[in-house]
Structures are given as C-alpha cells and as structure tokens.
C-alpha cells in the first residue's frame, strides 16, 4: 500500500498561472444575475494530478493550509515581534478562494482532507507521516517545501508537484537536498538543529 500526501497549496499555486476561469452567477441587489468569473486553474490542476494518482493500493490524503496562528504566537513570545513570515513578499496570485473551493470539492467526493486550524500544511504533513509511517510500504509527500525534506527515510520520499520540484529518496538525498553539500538523509535532523535551513 502507498500513501500519497499532497500539499495542496503547491498544486493550486502552480495551476493558477494557467488563467482558467469558471463563470458563476451572482445575485445583484435588483434581483438580476450578472456573470462573474472566478479563477479555477489551480483547482483544475490539483484535481487532474489527483486523478493521475488514483489506482488500487493507493491512498490519497490532501492537506490544506490554515493561517499559522500558533507559529505566529510562538514567534512573538520567543522573539518579541510579529515577524513569522512577515518579511516574505506577497505571492503573485492570491489562491485563498481556490483553496477553499478545492477543499470543498475534495471533501464532498469523499477524500480524507486534512487541515488543522492554526497550522500550515507542512505541520500537518509532518504529523501524518509520523502517524502512518509503519502502516504503509511507501509514503510519498507531494511538496516543494524544503522544510519537509528531513522526513525522507527508507519508506518516505518527496514527490514532484506536477512537473516542478524534486523527487527525493534516501539514495538521491545527498545530491539534491543542499546544493554543493553532501548531506546523508539520516543526518539532516542534526544539520537542521546545528545550522537551520
């Protein structure tokens, strides 16, 4: 059995650049409908990728972000400011609406969607891998988030997000994780502890 854990925001963001839209009616105050277009490219891309993974012996677990209130609070208490991801530039495309729409679709069709208020997807993915590690022959984490690369182990690999990102397993880990360094998969916890990202 395989478990594929998907960091859905990666897929939605990547697919959002396709500029696909869906027409939706919006009731106006004068009781007339006016066409309104909503972006759908990210949702479409995510659903296509999921359909490509569906086969016997494969479980698929989509994971969605929530506002990282817990980390922000911890950061503020530890460092005395609100700086957790505060200095990052805003993304070129806002995917919030598409994330909500994709999550609703996946829940409605019966996928075991995971999202925990106060936490980002990478926090939830870490917990899922630790919980299910011994229940599956192979776990694939579909993400471009390098913070999750330390989870690579004998039965845990990083999978691409569509055509983007890296495929990382214990054999390719030393060559792909940190450019110009030779880092063995089973030493990454120590490296992150000593040197950070």
Which positions does each model-derived feature cover?
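Domain-level signal for Mg2+-assisted phosphodiester chemistry and nucleotide/NA-binding surfaces
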Residues: 1-107
